[in-house]
């Protein structure tokens, strides 16, 4: 964490699950200031009171800025003096974005362009943009807008000598806001059947802590224009639902299949075939450098193409598949799950 000593970090969309995870990890370090930039004053007020209660000695390091990434001036107003940015602001609910695609464009695409424009103008040292596996071979509005967000980031990186811009791609972050596990827990507590979309559907799974780890890895190891992913495991939705049932006393026979929602895929991809051809293996991570060739293709016809890997696409069907016990152990290790289990024991 020495790179953050006395530095100012700005988190867009900072009142979400990712922002909370960053605060929990960073506040007790020697970071100078963390700026939470978001448009919901109620969530900011809740976060302010939460951290004043549980970390009163360091809560003053948090500064709150009301604004919207869609508004360039509000972004610029909050960015003066910022050293680093974690860009997490997004519309990420797949069905909602299917019904309101232009809202997804305004936040995920135009908002990202505003953040990166302001960052370059203000001389920010590094911006990490948070993307999603749905940006690879996208079929829904959310994934398409996040794919364009990545393209915007790469294009901006070509124009930036002083500001390093990288993207990270996530699978499903368990127990993050709007994710399915908290819904299932509520259904079990209320005596209702668990509802799932399609039992054989597979998804990458990772914890909020692993999500922060990926951003920090990109921050420390990424180069300008890079895309970085973690080699995450996956499981079927059926396995995930059964694991939650076993942990919280739900009845597996009560699991109800409701069908695939708008815009959903049977499996997700973290790296496409084309990206795998350029990917650099970094242990638990892959790094994909930007394609910084120019538009003058004549010289490439003469010189030939770069050397390419023989890797095939990295998706939730061909990664490590967790069985029921492995999935249950991974879910049980989450702090959110431990807190929910403790609440049940107290009743």
What is the meaning of each model-derived region?
Residues 7-29:
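N-terminal Rossmann NAD(P)H-binding glycine-rich loop of SDR-like oxidoreductase domains
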Residues 3, 151-175, 179-347:
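Strand-loop microenvironment adjacent to phosphate/nucleotide-handling motifs in alpha/beta enzyme folds
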Residues 63-84:
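Conserved Rossmann-fold cofactor-binding substructure of NAD(P)-dependent oxidoreductases
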Residues 12, 79-88, 129:
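Rossmann-fold scaffold of SDR-type NAD(P)-dependent oxidoreductases
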Residues 38, 65-66, 106, 198, ...:
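Conserved residues in the N-terminal Rossmann fold of short-chain dehydrogenase/reductase
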Residues 64, 104, 127, 165-168:
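Hydrophobic/aromatic anchor residues within beta-strands of the central parallel beta-sheet
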Residues 87, 91-151, 155:
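Conserved Rossmann-fold NAD(P)-dependent oxidoreductase catalytic core, especially the SDR/UDP-sugar
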Residues 30-43:
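Conserved glycine-rich Rossmann-like NAD(P)H-binding loop of the short-chain dehydrogenase/reductase
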């Amino acid at each position: 964490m020495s790179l953050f000593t006395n530095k100012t970090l700005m988190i867009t969309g900072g009142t979400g699950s990712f922002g909370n995870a960053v605060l929990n990890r960073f506040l007790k370090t020697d970071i100078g200031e963390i700026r939470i930039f978001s448009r919901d004053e109620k969530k900011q007020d809740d976060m302010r009171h939460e951290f004043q209660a549980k970390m009163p000695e360091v809560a003053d390091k948090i500064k709150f800025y009301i604004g919207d990434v869609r508004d360039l001036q509000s972004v610029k107003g909050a960015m003066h003096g910022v050293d680093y940015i974690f860009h997490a602001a997004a519309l990420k609910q797949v069905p909602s974005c299917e019904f309101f695609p232009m809202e997804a464009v305004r936040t995920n695409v135009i908002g990202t362009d505003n953040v990166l424009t302001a960052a370059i103008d203000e001389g920010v040292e590094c911006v990490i943009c948070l993307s999603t596996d749905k940006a690879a071979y996208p079929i829904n509005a959310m994934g398409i807008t996040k794919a364009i967000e990545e393209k915007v980031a790469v294009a901006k990186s070509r124009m930036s000598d002083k500001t390093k811009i990288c993207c990270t791609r996530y699978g499903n972050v368990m127990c993050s806001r709007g994710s399915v596990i908290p819904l299932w827990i509520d259904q079990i507590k209320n005596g209702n059947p668990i509802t799932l979309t399609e039992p054989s559907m597979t998804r990458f799974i990772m914890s909020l802590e692993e999500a922060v780890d990926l951003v920090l890895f990109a921050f420390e190891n990424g180069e300008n224009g890079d895309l970085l992913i973690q080699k995450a495991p996956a499981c079927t939705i059926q396995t995930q639902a059964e694991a939650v049932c076993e942990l919280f006393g739900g009845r597996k026979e009560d699991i109800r299949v409701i069908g695939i929602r708008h815009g959903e895929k049977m499996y997700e991809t973290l790296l496409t075939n084309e990206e795998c051809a350029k990917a650099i293996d970094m242990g638990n991570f892959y790094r994909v450098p930007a394609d910084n060739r120019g538009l003058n293709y004549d010289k490439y016809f003469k010189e030939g193409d770069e050397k390419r890997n023989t890797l095939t696409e990295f998706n939730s069907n061909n990664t490590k598949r967790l069985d029921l016990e492995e999935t249950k152990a991974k879910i049980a290790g989450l702090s959110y799950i431990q807190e929910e289990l403790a609440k049940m024991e107290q009743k």
